[in-house]
Amino acid sequence: MPGEQMDPTGSQLDSDFSQQDTPCLIIEDSQPESQVLEEDAGSHFSVLSRHLPNLQMHKENPVLDIVSNPEQSAVEQGDSNSSFNEHLKEKKASDPVESSHLGTSGSISQVIERLPQPNRTSSALAVTVEAASLPEEEKEEEELEEEKEGVGANAPGADSLAAEDSASSQLGFGVLELSQSQDVEEHTVPYDVNQEHLQLVTTNSGSSPLSDVDASTAIKCEEQPTEDIAMIEQPSKDIPVTVQPGKGIHVVEEQNLPLVRSEDRPSSPQVSVAAVETKEQVPARELLEEGPQVQPSSEPEVSSTQEDLFDQSSKTASDGCSTPSREEGGCSPVSTPATTLQLLQLSGQKPLVQESLSTNSSDLVAPSPDAFRSTPFIVPSSPTEQGGRKDEPMDMSVIPVGGEPFQKLHDDEAMETEKPLLPSQPAVSPQASTPVSRSTPVFTPGSLPIPSQPEFSHDIFIPSPSLEEPSDDVKKGGGLHSSSLTVECSKTSESEPKNFTDDLGLSMTGDSCKLMLSTSEYSQSSKMESLGSPRTEEDRENTQIDDTEPLSPVSNSKLPADSENVLVTPSQDDQVEMSQNVDKAKEDETEDRGDCKGREDAVAEDVCIDLTCDSGSQAVPSPATRSEALSSVLDQEEAMDTKEHHPEEGFSGSEVEEVPETPCGSHREEPKEEPMESIPLHLSLTETQSEALCLQKEAPKEECPEAMEVETSVISIDSPQKLQVLDQELEHKDPDTWEEATSEDSSVVIVDVKEPSPRADVSCEPLEEVEKCSDSQSWEGVAPEEEPCAENRLDTPEEKRIECDGDSKAETTEKDAVTEDSPQPPLPSVRDEPVRPDQETQQPQVQEKESPVTVDAEVADDKQLGPEGACQQLEKAPACASQSFCESSSETPFHFTLPKEGDIIPPLTGATPPLIGHLKLEPKRHSTPIGISNYPESTIATSDVTSESMVEINDPLLGNEKGDSESAPEMDGKLSLKMKLVSPETEASEESLQFSLEKPTTAERKNGSTAIAEPVASLQKPVPVFGCIYEAQQEKEAQSEAPPSAPDRANLLHFPSAQEEDKERPDVTPKLRQSEQPVKPVGPVMDDAAPEDSASPVSQQRASQEQRASQEPFSPAEDVMETDLLEGLAANQDRPSKMLMDRPTQSNIGIQTVDHSLCAPETVSAATQTVKSVCEQGTSTAEQNSGKQDATVQTERGSGEKPASAPVDDTESLHSQGEEEFEMPQPPHGHVLHRHMRTIREVRTLVTRVITDVYYVDGTEVERKVTEETEEPIVECQECETEVSPSQTGGSSGDLGDISSFSSKASSSHHTSSGTSLSAIHSSGSSGRGAGPLKGKASGTEAADFALPSSRGGPGKLSPRKGISQTGAPVCEEDGDAGLGIRQGGKAPVTPRGRGRRGRPPSRTTGTRETVVSGPLGVEDISPSMSPDDKSFTRIMPRVPDSTKRTDASSSTLRRSDSPEIPFQAATGSSDGLDSSSSGNSFVGLRVVAKWSSNGYFYSGKITRDVGAGKYKLLFDDGYECDVLGKDILLCDPIPLDTEVTALSEDEYFSAGVVKGHRKESGELYYSIEKEGQRKWYKRMAVILSLEQGNRLREQYGLGPYEAVTPLTKAADISLDNLVEGKRKRRSNISSPVTPTAASSSSTTPTRKATESPRASTGVPSGKRKLPTSEEERSPAKRGRKSATVKPGTVGAAEFVSPCETGDNIGEPSVLEEPRGPLPLNKTLFLGYAFLLTMATTSDKLASRSKLLDGPTGSSEEEEEFLEIPPFNKQYTECQLRAGAGYILEDFNEAQCNTAYQCLLIADQHCRTRKYFLCLASGIPCVSHVWVHDSCHANQLQNYRNYLLPAGYSLEEQRILDWQPRENPFQNLKVLLVSDQQQNFLELWSEILMTGGAASVKQHHSSAHNKDIALGVFDVVVTDPSCPASVLKCAEALQLPVVSQEWVIQCLIVGERIGFKQHPKYKHDYVSH
């Protein structure tokens, strides 16, 4: 290859040409093929990179600027150098390569600086220009090096420029100009115009200098004629010129760069071709005057597409990549559609590279076919033409404004176009690509016209590829825009192996924009962990492989494609912006692309193919030939490119790796700069770069502005569908095709992606796929390097690429989870887009578009099949399949899409082997093929079990499509729903289910979207995971390591579940589900009941959505609405569901459980009920998989609700969950749900069983029976009988939204497991709602995902003592209401956790209090180890148990899943107030306001039992339960008017107010609270009373004279449930006015408080229960009772108390009276923990009390709180710990402490005992004994961090300091201990100092006067008053500090070494008294 590259005209061209003969490359042989291919590869990526930036940085469109402001253009041209220098400098700052390039090429660098003004352009152009200025060979080498160094720094651009020299710079400029002209076309966008102008100027300036300097150097050296062409056609030709001088390695580099140039040029040429024919006259004119208008006139559809692509590219990439985009000028048109169709953009860029190749050597001009778009450039780019072009670039500078150079370009382009057959077809294409042509004037006329025409021809013909060579032409001409993009991509690809690496960053001037975009996207891909990038790369690579037959092109192609994908995927954060920006860009494009629409339509189609054709353009000629020839060519070229470009490839790989870094910045910038456009791109790219491009193009076709976006989204959706079709087709495809596809994995994926966007891209996609085959192979050689660099370089190019793809895929899947969110914003676009594309009429394929994308793709494929033959389609299918695998996330949708019936399935038959091959490769690529595996396994599964495999793929779609198809769902809102429904249950019969789903989707959403498309959409619908995305990402990462096949299967099961469910419900929901069940069992029958539910939640969640989708899809409006709602609500609700699905997908087991979920949905009602039971059972699962549990509950709820009001409930499953939950009376629509919840709570301590029977009708509690039995209770179980009315599954509890149905009998059956699962929590019901299903699925992480936000009581907050009741409330907590009564607000979505769904049917939904007994196993562990969210979740579970009582009915009612809110209670009526009718006591069942003893606040609740001794068991509305003294119970409900209360506002802060009114809604009481003159309604739970406020009501409303019943001492009010230390809590509250919520976060009443919305709000943070620091108190300060008793609170350090341990606590008077707390039911509760127990000495307590009183933080409240703290009985605590398998350390033993899983010191307060100090020194957490109490009470391990004791009282700060992890405060300290051994001073402090890290401690007995001490070796002397004077004198002489033990103590308390004289007590002779 190097040699050939050296000989542009020589062997490379010939060999490459011969290799590429089959692909339409021959048609464009004006460029040597080998060189073209190689250059194309780099160029392709470069251009793509630039293109992406263009797409993303639409706003900075120099071309637009030029068009808008010709004067400005001139000025900018004048300023080009300075502007470029500025940009270069900017770029320099970011990209060393650029800066070096700048230095190298003065003029070029100036131009680059100009171009750099747009963000992307700057980086790409800067590099390119700089590179151009370098001598050809020098530059190439430099660029290679720079590529390597500047990958991060726009290395691709640099490489391209460097390698291409002037060609490169010109290419960059050409592209820039082209891009500018395209932007000009889009100049409607003023800012774009300015940017475009700037870019145009830059291009001109760069073109001129480049053409003069670099172009002359590079072009003269390499190929003066080509150079001219390169200059004119996007300095791509310059690159070829560079290639010629830079022979050998340089040639390789150059070819890569030239490819980039070519790509840039081809982009321009595409424009040029169009311009030559249509745009030649209009281009400059239109670019400047009527950019958009000319486009339409030239070729409305294609032009529009290209322009839109370019516009978007310009706008998008204009800022950062505008220059690159401009460089891609010709490509840019394609690029413009690429905004919508990012792949297209890549295509556009590739042509530049290819052009560059052509330019590289005169021969290379012929091989332009490699860069088909570039070919036109190549042909006109004859050696003479190159010279002309060289000059032309300068003219271009002027002409872009004038438009004359554009015509020049057009002429050149026409010539070139005529040269290759494609060009003549592109003649038409150029029209389509006229926008590009317009852009071309901005470019150098030469470079622009030549590549543009062939490329345009290609693009134009793409839509209707009927000839094989014409097919290439179609690719070039028919898909000219595509060609433009493809050429860019191809060239980028070819140049990009080296150039892309460079180009990715900077190298690609023309490519820069695209490449920058590509780079950005690529970098984003990198950011996405190459997830999107590889996938995108795969897509683009696949798309571009054909374009870029040379490995380099392929690699570059892939990289740019990936880059675009990356842009789409990586900028998930940006993606939202991008999505919005894309919308804006699309709007802009709409203006500018009104014209472009038609063109873009064609372009979209073309582009997709073009991308494939870019590298495949050479191979495109005949589908089969192309496949084989391309395969061989690609293989050869891969080898050649690999060899030739190995420096480059090493570069490429290196650069590619770096590229992600540089592009990351660029990309990130890009997405941000062009977020709107970027988003569609992101989505598209995420799904598949080619798809993205296609989408963008298609969208412009239909509706340039919106259509593009829509297309992108649609493609995303379509992609999945098509992917399915492709997968199926691939399965059916010949093994050869499969192999091809395998080698073309990315290309296949792209095809898949594109196929989803077949409407515009369908015809393109087949070409693409054929090309992708070639590209795939090329890519394997080159792209793999780049991609591997980006991802993980594979050793072999193919392996590399595949592995990269795999990595990309896996990462994409993981990232997609992340990206899911970002794609989400585009989702709306997608939703709109489907309409737009449908509306727009992608003329030949409008119907197809509207019709299932798969069908569209099929038609397109068929179209292409004619010209390209089935082989092309087969290639496409394999490519798609491969790509599918590569892009697990984004491609999954495609896989789903592809398999649609009647679509491309037949052609894709041969794709099956690629799927398998890709699967094989995928694992390589990604160690954890979770996302990847999904694809590969999906593919394999597809082969083996189509439906399952489809499902599998669909699941990846979940992951991938979450990001990609998520937008697709917006486009295809209905499709999304359909798809999703299908996926969970279509595991077995996924296809049919998918189809069923899709058909409705097709009819409703996409018109043409088949079931697969719908399923994709459906699957994506859950994708809305803005909040869940993070969880998804985290959990994916956590679970993504699940077995690949399992994840796939899970995905399959799961996703199909959604579709199946959708189908099943509409068709034969029960039957289908049942039938599916057997298949699903694959997933996990782990918990047939629970797993079903487990899966059920997700599947049901999805299913409900999907059902709704399938139901609604029947009515497009409804479905759309639902889709939108689902998008929004599902975003929250589906977020968890999707997350669950995704994660399960990654965790094969989990997904399979989801399948079970499908199984659970066997009977919808059963499923719903199952979900309910799952909820109950889910508790146990919840523990393990709280997240899933939540999802399950929500899913179940959604499913159940869905039947009633599928659109509303499911759509707003979150809404429903949140709202319905708290409006539990509301039955699901149409459901008459009779549910009987029997909650049996067995209180071990009381040995009294209170059986509460709550009867619900439609979720409304109609009857409550409380039976009290005095048996020895063993556990709390909940039995739920639910009659679900015929209404769909489980409308059992309307208010639950069918969640009750979930908890119905299934719930009851699951209650046991739930209990087990929640063992500690006891709140199976509430948490169970989500947990049950989780259990089945491997969704431990998911549980975490859905874990309650800590806010509710969160893990730590959740005082286990109330853990049970917490379970119910925590569920609410998990909803976002946690802090407030809001919880109930039905704001499941509020829960950012992705638990939105779950919030609605939170465990309490299931009402599975039953499992209150459930052990703390999963949840318990989660609590301590999991994130706060998980803990919150855990909390939810615990709360459920207690809640079970109070929310017994509530559970059916969804139990205020948001939080234990009054509304829920109100809704539940007596349900909330657990045994409303008490057995025996007249007060039982009364609603009261009672004091939570731990924090002194009064909360609303109900008396459930008369415990005796003046105490009553109270169930608080927030689910907490405890015994309260009668004196602390106020019989005032509602709270009387004009009473001062404390209300928790939505901001989660409590503030005082006055009750001014009451009102009841749905049984929930609301207070009108007046605060500061403003009145606001608060839920009952949000209104509490401070101690003072409550005391005011005691006299009148106190519950009798019970206050005397128990001692008033601190322990008096304390109940086991009130164990949390009030002080800590209160202090917490003090710190933030949050109040009990915060307090709840603190262990004091964390659960309860957290549960209570007020407390919950603060609870969200799950603030630690910090006994010590008053500052930390969040709950409102509780004033009032001060106790003389010493509080465990802060211990004053006033006097040093000997650290010796006191044997016992100072017994507290009420210790005996106070319940100590139960022994843990869970016999392994504390397993793995080692405990040290110590008690505060009397002096500690006195000191603490004095400090509290006197200290700054001292307050009566704190003391009061402490009084409320449960008494500490050391012996009993030891019993509790031992009963829970805890290990008690009798003495501090560091070795033993280290061997334990966790060593804790249990104490009643911070103290000054030896153990306490040793633990402070060693960093062992000191935990309050309340933690033990709470953990035992909840039977679940609480988060000890919420119970941490303070380190102690700081003398210096005069306050109690919190415990902080500390290590070695005495690090390396050499200490001399001197004492007379009083209080064992020497040994004690020696041990403490050594434990604290002291280097050495020497003990010196004061009485040992005869011993001499060498004080000089010590750092400090620690002594006591017994220190001998001699030692003191010696120390004074040595200036050795002499301190007392207090200094050591203070160091321990502060956690670091402190000053020796900071306090008088540090004096050794200080006497405390």
From Swiss-Prot:
**Positions bearing the Glycyl lysine isopeptide (Lys-Gly) (interchain with G-Cter in ubiquitin) cross-link:** 1682
Q: What residue spans carry the Polar residues bias annotation?
A: 8-22, 69-85, 101-110, 294-324, 426-442, 481-490, 517-528, 566-582, 614-634, 935-949, 1178-1197
MF term (GO), any: transcription coregulator activity
Chief location of this protein within or outside the cell: nucleus
Acidic residues composition bias: residue spans? 135-148, 1269-1282
* Residue positions, PTM Phosphothreonine: 305, 543, 548, 662, 912, 1211, 1606, 1635, 1645
Name the GO terms of the biological process aspect: cellular response to X-ray; DNA damage response; DNA repair; double-strand break repair via classical nonhomologous end joining; double-strand break repair via nonhomologous end joining; negative regulation of double-strand break repair via homologous recombination; positive regulation of isotype switching; positive regulation of transcription by RNA polymerase II
GO CC annotation terms, alphabetical: chromosome, telomeric region; cytoplasm; DNA repair complex; kinetochore; nuclear body; nucleus; replication fork; site of double-strand break
Q: Where is this region: Disordered?
A: 1-24, 67-168, 254-337, 352-599, 614-707, 754-870, 927-1017, 1034-1144, 1178-1231, 1267-1478, 1624-1715
Give the UniProt subcellular location, in the record's own words: Nucleus; Chromosome; Chromosome, Centromere, Kinetochore
Q: What is the top-level taxon of the source organism?
A: Eukaryota
Domain (BRCT): give its ranges: 1749-1845, 1861-1961
Pinpoint the Glycyl lysine isopeptide (Lys-Gly) (interchain with G-Cter in SUMO1) cross-link. 220, 1431, 1560
Keywords of the record, alphabetical order, are: Activator, Centromere, Chromosome, DNA damage, DNA repair, DNA-binding, Isopeptide bond, Kinetochore, Methylation, Nucleus, Phosphoprotein, Repeat, Transcription, Transcription regulation, Ubl conjugation
Keyword tRNA processing set for record? no
Motif window: GAR? 1393-1400
SMART domains recorded = BRCT
Any idea which residues bear Omega-N-methylarginine here?
1329, 1352
Question: Which SUPFAM superfamilies does the record cross-reference, listed alphabetically?
Answer: BRCT domain, Tudor/PWWP/MBT
Instruction: Enumerate the residue ranges of region (Interaction with dimethylated histone H4).
Output: 1492-1520
Q: Where is this motif: UDR?
A: 1601-1628
Q: Which residues carry this modification: Phosphoserine?
A: 30, 68, 73, 109, 169, 179, 181, 267-268, 297, 368, 382, 397, 429, 452, 464, 507, 518, 523, 525, 552, 579, 622, 627, 631-632, 684, 716, 719, 763, 822, 965, 1018, 1075, 1096, 1115, 1213, 1216, 1314, 1339, 1359, 1365, 1423, 1427, 1457, 1459, 1470-1471, 1615, 1628, 1632, 1653, 1670, 1675, 1698, 1756
Residue ranges with Low complexity bias: 158-168, 1099-1112, 1295-1326, 1469-1478, 1631-1648
Q: What does this protein do?
A: Double-strand break (DSB) repair protein involved in response to DNA damage, telomere dynamics and class-switch recombination (CSR) during antibody genesis. Plays a key role in the repair of double-strand DNA breaks (DSBs) in response to DNA damage by promoting non-homologous end joining (NHEJ)-mediated repair of DSBs and specifically counteracting the function of the homologous recombination (HR) repair protein BRCA1. In response to DSBs, phosphorylation by ATM promotes interaction with RIF1 and dissociation from NUDT16L1/TIRR, leading to recruitment to DSBs sites.
Q: How does it assemble?
A: Homoligomer. Interacts with p53/TP53 (via the central domain). Interacts with DCLRE1C. Interacts with histone H2AX and this requires phosphorylation of H2AX on 'Ser-139'. Interacts with histone H4 that has been dimethylated at 'Lys-20' (H4K20me2). Has low affinity for histone H4 containing monomethylated 'Lys-20' (H4K20me1). Does not bind histone H4 containing unmethylated or trimethylated 'Lys-20' (H4K20me3). Has low affinity for histone H3 that has been dimethylated on 'Lys-79'. Has very low affinity for histone H3 that has been monomethylated on 'Lys-79' (in vitro).
In its UniProt entry, what is this protein called? TP53-binding protein 1
What organism does the UniProt record list as the source?
Mus musculus
Which lineage do the record's taxonomy fields give for this organism?
Eukaryota, Metazoa, Chordata, Craniata, Vertebrata
Q: Which gene encodes it?
A: Tp53bp1
